[in-house]
Amino acid sequence: MRWAAALLLLLAIPRRAPAMAQDWNSDSALALARRAIEHRSHAAVDTALRDYRAQAHGFLFFLGQFGEGLSEPPRLVKADQLELEVYWKAPGLSKQRIIGWRDRAELPTDISYHRDHLGIVQNNFGRALRLGEGDEVRDVPHPLAPGGTDVYDFALGDTSAIVLPTRAVRVVALRVRPKHFAAAAIVGTLFVDIESAQLVRMAFNFTPKAYLDPQLEDVSIVLDNALLEERYWLPYRQEIEIRRRATWLDVPARGIIRGRWEIDSYQFNLDLPDSLFRGEEIVAAPKPVRDSFPWRAP
């Protein structure tokens, strides 16, 4: 298995000036978007990748800001560290099992995370985006889902090169925004492999209409993929930040959840049984198993 470690050494090679407003929905931008949509729609037909197993290493930080104006820096309230077994099977089955979990509280808290905060994003969210088990964000159209060009505008950005031992992969930034900002949608940048039209990176926020919880201020997400077997762009690193306004003892407060994940140790085509994927996507091993996980560092 070869990792695209050079993903960390992204070398910008300017091909054009940054896209201006008049570049939205140019022929070349829409052509690339449609190629990416087509690839995602038919990815399951690629029988070379039937399934995989991987390991995910994650941290969740809960921070708080307190007081009028919320001008003080956030304070760490609680930190959680998690280890997961990650499974995927074509066309889009996902299972994650928490095998290690430890936490430390710096301040009193009774926070309880949504189940999907405890794992990674598979399939780059699929056709629609959902967070907080549907309580925070639900049914937001993915810009690279079928019909994405009817919902979103696209504009080309700069082209970059990811230098691998055997070749260089050209990646182009594809900016995305909704045609109607009053709709539930995302705003951000997609990075697409020009040759294969696979999604390499997503960095985005949501429009206000997407937030179902009225206390939500902002959600920002970055999904980085790595090139494996010189063919498949699969989850490599992910970050999420959720900011929510509230009150604490009648004092204005802001709660911030920050999640950071790294995914590695991929094994391919293990003939995983369908029974493995039954039930909830994210499950936890028994507590004695989680408590006995051999952490690498104190």
Where are these regions (language model features)?
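C-terminal segment of classical bacterial N-terminal signal peptides
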Residues: 11-18
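Beta-strand-dense domains in secreted/periplasmic systems and polymorphic toxin scaffolds
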Residues: 202, 236-240
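Extended lipid/amphipathic-ligand handling interfaces
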Residues: 41, 188-190, 194, 220-230
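Surface-exposed extracellular loop regions of Gram-negative outer-membrane beta-barrel proteins
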Residues: 198-201, 205
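Structured extracytoplasmic
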Residues: 20-187, 208-212, 218, 242-298
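Sec-dependent N-terminal signal peptides
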Residues: 3-11
